[in-house]
């Protein structure tokens, strides 16, 4: 084989490699664009609410008034998944402080495609109270988060569309508009900035029935915990009242083997220290 043929072969090889690389990049880009809005939201739910088989964290909630006065809620949050991602879940929360919520517990049985079951144990009156489905949009223990914000909203309850793709800071995001199919919530639609890399929601904007911006959620800090990108600090602001809630997750862990027996009315009243400390 002469020198010209060898050079020609090398050139063809380089061209083929370059074309293969371009094809791979194009395929990756097209695969992202091929995602429907529902698929993006589902991936976001999985990344935000379903990572690991189970989850535990100590949570500090700082409730801050328009004037700057602060109240602190401290609790332990536990969560266990049942079945495939996007399926049933159970949540258990135990409150340490302040005094008016000390020893209070909250439990959720989350179901796909039907209303979740929620219970609240109030130690002051030694009573377990069931949270009605219509109360899912009410304030969670006086914070700017709702009960539904804590455990997630069923994907099928909203109509979703990708309205644009843009950067939020350094992150490439899908911007999803989610419009409730029923008028049983206090907002008309929500815009979500969802990271294209890890699919975590980085920002949510809630618009009220008049179409005015009413609440804003921001993921302020993301850390890797056992290989799971985890939002460890999040803020919800109520633009109408000027109130905001800053939530920090500390001592976070995944796949610790939470027992099924924890999620019972018995342990709502007497939570085991093994899981709450």
Language-model features and meaning:
Residues 76-83, 161-167, 220-222:
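Short amphipathic beta-strand and strand-loop transition segments with alternating hydrophobic
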Residues 96, 107-109, 117-121, 127-131, ...:
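Gly/Pro-enriched, hydrophobic low-complexity segments
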Residues 37-124:
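N-terminal mature ectodomain segment of secretory-pathway/periplasmic proteins
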Residues 33, 65-67, 101, 184, ...:
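Residue-level signal for secondary-structure boundary sites
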Residues 266-276:
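Short, low-complexity, Pro/Ser/Thr/Gly-rich segments in the mature regions of secreted, periplasmic
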Residues 152-158, 165:
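Surface-exposed beta-loop interaction hotspot
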Residues 1-31:
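Short, basic, low-complexity termini and linkers enriched in Ser/Thr/Gly/Pro
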């Amino acid at each position: 084989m002469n020198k010209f043929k060898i050079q020609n072969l090398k050139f063809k090889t380089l061209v083929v490699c370059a074309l293969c690389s371009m094809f791979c990049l194009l395929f990756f880009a097209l695969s992202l664009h091929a995602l429907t809005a529902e698929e993006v939201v589902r991936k976001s739910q999985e990344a935000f609410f379903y990572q690991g088989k189970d989850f535990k964290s100590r949570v500090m909630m700082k409730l801050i008034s328009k004037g700057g006065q602060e109240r602190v809620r401290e609790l332990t949050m536990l969560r266990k998944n049942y079945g495939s991602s996007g399926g049933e879940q159970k949540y258990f929360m135990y409150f340490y402080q302040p005094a008016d919520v000390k020893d209070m517990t909250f439990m959720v049985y989350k179901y796909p495609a039907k209303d979740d079951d929620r219970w609240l144990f109030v130690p002051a009156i030694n009573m377990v109270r069931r949270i009605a489905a219509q109360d899912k949009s009410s304030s969670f223990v006086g914070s700017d988060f709702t009960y539904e914000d804590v455990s997630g909203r069923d994907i099928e309850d909203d109509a979703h569309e990708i309205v644009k793709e843009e950067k939020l800071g350094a992150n490439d995001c899908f911007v999803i508009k989610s419009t409730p199919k029923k008028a049983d919530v206090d907002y008309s639609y929500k815009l979500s900035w969802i990271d294209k890399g890890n699919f975590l929601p980085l920002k949510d904007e809630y618009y009220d029935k008049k179409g005015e911006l009413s609440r804003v959620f921001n993921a302020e800090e993301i850390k890797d915990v056992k290989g799971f990108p985890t939002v460890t600090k999040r803020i919800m602001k109520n633009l109408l009242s000027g109130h905001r809630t800053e939530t920090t997750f500390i001592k976070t862990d995944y796949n610790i083997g939470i027992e099924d027996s924890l999620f019972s009315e018995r342990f709502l009243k007497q939570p085991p220290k093994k899981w709450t400390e």
